[in-house]
Amino acid sequence: MLVIAGLGNPGKTYENTRHNVGFMAIDELSKEWNIELNKTKFNGLYGMGFVSGKKVLLVKPLTYMNLSGECLRPILDYYDADHEDLKVIYDDLDLPTGKIRLRTKGSAGGHNGIKSLIQHLGTPEFDRVRIGIGRPVNGMKVVDYVLGAFTKEEAPHINDAVSKTVKACEASLTKPFLEVMNEFNANV
């Protein structure tokens, strides 16, 4: 089984904000793979299907970003999945807007959603797809920036990054993640 989780904040207020780019990617995967997100349990919205012969679970935690681990740990337990079955998609301030970077493990890097996951999973060893949202300019506070909407100029870059994320997730169904990581990171 493959569990793909996109991190974000629930509710209309946060739709299409920089911090919710993980949710955007899950929505796109849901459309591409025809997996309806129709279950609400474990503080999450999720759906299950089969893609390329593999059982896939797409998840959007409905906890706030900083509590994402409270949703994903119980889902992994319920479906008898492990951290090695998990791929997490989330925003990254340290990457330029629209760039993606894949990693197999690492620290939280200041991202509270990832910090929560590491705490609840008991390990930093899970696959990640980071989508760059850039850094705030002109003295804007980070919290205001990540909870703000993408500008008209940023939107096409984010749409492209979400498309690349879908392709990376598709590739990881048939190839080892390390191989997918090397392929996609080389083209960043």
Curated annotation (Swiss-Prot):
It comes from the Bacteria. Coiled coil: none annotated. One of its GO terms (molecular function) is peptidyl-tRNA hydrolase activity. It is an enzyme of class 3 (hydrolase). The record marks D91 as: Stabilizes the basic form of H active site to accept a proton. Keywords: Cytoplasm, Hydrolase, RNA-binding, tRNA-binding. GO terms for biological process: protein quality control for misfolded or incompletely synthesized proteins; rescue of stalled ribosome. It holds the Pfam family Pept_tRNA_hydro. The record marks N9 as: Discriminates between blocked and unblocked aminoacyl-tRNA. Its main location: cytoplasm. Transmembrane segments: none annotated. Belongs to the PTH family. PANTHER family: PEPTIDYL-TRNA HYDROLASE (PTHR17224:SF1). Monomer. Gene3D superfamilies: Peptidyl-tRNA hydrolase. It comes from Bacillus velezensis (strain DSM 23117 / BGSC 10A6 / LMG 26770 / FZB42). TRNA binds at Y14, Y64, N66, N112. This is Peptidyl-tRNA hydrolase. The keyword RNA-binding applies. Its EC number is 3.1.1.29. HAMAP family: Pept_tRNA_hydro_bact. One of its GO terms (cellular component) is cytoplasm. InterPro entries: Pept_tRNA_hydro, Pept_tRNA_hydro_CS, Pept_tRNA_hydro_sf.
